């Protein structure tokens, strides 16, 4: 009998509704892709791209909330793309989702109604020793401005870009969107009430000029460390964050 493959684990999100396959060590899914998926204003029939999809967690969470989407995941790391492709089968999405292995600058095609993305978040410092984590966490040949530019380029006119990133990069995000997008909705994500925001979710409309909106923030944890009811509704029940 063939021994079990211990290089990956099969796990669940959204209270068991979503299956993901991911490396047993190195890059592991956190809550960012789940929050990202909850913030995507998708409708059945739309074309959706997840740029840098990793193992597909955000795509699969979005599909669980909004049936009938046409989903594309783009991932440059072949191993993560392989796990994402396995996730397509595990979630019964073979007819509506595809995973493309390649670089955002070279392999992204469109046009898409919505591009969702959780870009590499660190622009400097020492990369993690694990290759999959380094690729997911560190900007490489495409910096944040370039990443956003490529995402906007494959959007339909008036299409929307939705991204999650570290709160301290908000000024860089808004600078990259300037003169190329508007109707920008900014939602801070707080670890606990009274703390500085840890993440921001930014939803921008390509070629729009509507003024920006600062939305109410989401607090993830109560003082005792448990998820707040609002966070629990998203992370376990799969509710939208719109």
Locations of the language-model features?
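Class I SAM-dependent transferase core
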Residues: 2-42
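Conserved beta-strand segments of alpha/beta enzyme cores
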Residues: 19, 70, 96-98, 182-185
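Conserved Class I SAM-dependent methyltransferase catalytic core
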Residues: 25, 142-191, 195-197
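Residue-level signal for inorganic ion chemistry
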Residues: 36, 118, 147, 204
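Conserved SAM/SAH cofactor-binding pocket of Class I
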Residues: 39-117, 123-129
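Mobile active-site "lid"/loop adjacent to the S-adenosyl-L-methionine
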Residues: 119-146, 150-153
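SAM/dcSAM-binding transferase cores
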Residues: 196-242
């Amino acid at each position: 009998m063939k021994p079990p493959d211990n290089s990956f684990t099969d796990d669940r999100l959204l209270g068991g509704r979503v299956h993901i396959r991911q490396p047993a060590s190195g890059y592991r899914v956190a809550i960012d892709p789940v929050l990202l998926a909850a913030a995507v204003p998708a409708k059945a029939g739309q074309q959706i791209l997840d740029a840098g999809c990793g193992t597909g967690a955000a795509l699969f969470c979005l599909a669980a909330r909004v049936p009938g989407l046409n989903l594309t995941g783009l991932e440059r790391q072949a191993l993560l793309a392989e796990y994402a492709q396995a996730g397509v089968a595990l979630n019964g999405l073979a007819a509506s989702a595809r995973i493309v292995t390649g670089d955002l600058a070279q392999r992204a095609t469109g046009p898409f109604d919505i591009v969702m993305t959780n870009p590499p978040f660190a622009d400097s410092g020492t990369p993690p020793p694990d290759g999959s984590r380094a690729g997911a966490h560190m900007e490489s040949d495409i910096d944040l401005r370039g990443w956003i530019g490529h995402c906007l380029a494959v959007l339909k006119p008036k299409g929307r870009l939705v991204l999650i990133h570290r709160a301290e990069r908000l000024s860089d995000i808004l600078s990259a969107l300037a003169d190329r997008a508007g109707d920008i909705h900014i939602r801070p994500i707080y670890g606990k009430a009274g703390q500085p925001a840890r993440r921001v979710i930014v939803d921008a409309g390509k070629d729009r000029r509507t003024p920006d909106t600062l939305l109410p923030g989401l607090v993830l944890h109560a003082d005792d460390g448990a998820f707040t009811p609002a966070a629990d509704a998203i992370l376990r029940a799969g509710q939208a964050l719109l």
